[in-house]
Amino acid sequence: MTEATFSPDRRAMMGLAALGLAAAALPIGANAALANEPAGGAPPKTGLTPDQALARLQAGNSKFLGNNRPLADLSNARRLALAKGQAPYAALVGCADSRVSPEHLFGEGLGELFVVRTAGNYVDDAGLGSLAYSVAALGVPLIVVVGHERCGAVDAATKLVTGNKQLPPVLTRMVEPILPAVVDAQAHHASQGGDLLDHAIHYNVSHVVKQLRESRDPLFSEPLSEGKLKIVGAYYDLDTGKVEFFDRG
């Protein structure tokens, strides 16, 4: 969403919903306070490095592709353990599309992935705060922005830019954050050819990756500079089921 569509009151309400009342009440940049929040019997934070977390996602997608899909642990014991707290090893920004369920694509169950989903996999204030919480409070070492083949939101943004479609006001506002990626994709398409929509989907992912990497909030900038956090892009092929990672920095 653009700044104009987010009033301070609405931004605050969405931030509280995303982070929880206790976390949202902390001052911005309170890394230590978030990181040292009492666990209350919660599982320990992941010990994976960013590269190890990425390798686990890749391995999970390989199993998904090979029909060797491990059964997720949905037992009562697992549920009760997670009731005490969460310790995901990766955060994902994904599209709201019903065909793109991150847990299935990467063969994971409850409590393994911290997922933020919006149509078009962009990040607004609530999403940004949610991701910051996953890094600072939960110790996530990896954020992956996942776009996907034939994304309806990016397609709508592309048609809006090319003048081939008009959208209702609420949908126009929804795709506004995607429009700069479409403009960049148009320039690439003019010189390189190929499918404009596919280019726009990739550029949209790269724009969000850049947005997160260049955030001035210390909850992102500090772990990035220390090598404790990595932010990468990915593209999910609906036809093959394969997730291609790119823009790894």
Language-model segment annotations:
Residues 188-230:
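Charged, glycine-interspersed solvent-exposed loop segments at helix/strand-loop junctions
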Residues 60, 95-97, 118-119, 148, ...:
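Fold-independent oxyanion-binding glycine-rich loops
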Residues 70-128:
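Conserved beta-strand-loop surface patch within small alpha/beta domains used
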Residues 28-66, 70-74:
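C-terminal segment of N-terminal export signals and the immediately downstream linker at the start
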Residues 2, 50, 102-197, 201, ...:
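Short HxH-centered metal-ligating active-site micro-motif
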Residues 57, 92, 145, 233, ...:
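Divalent metal-coordination and catalytic microenvironments
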Residues 223-245:
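GST superfamily/GST-like fold recognition
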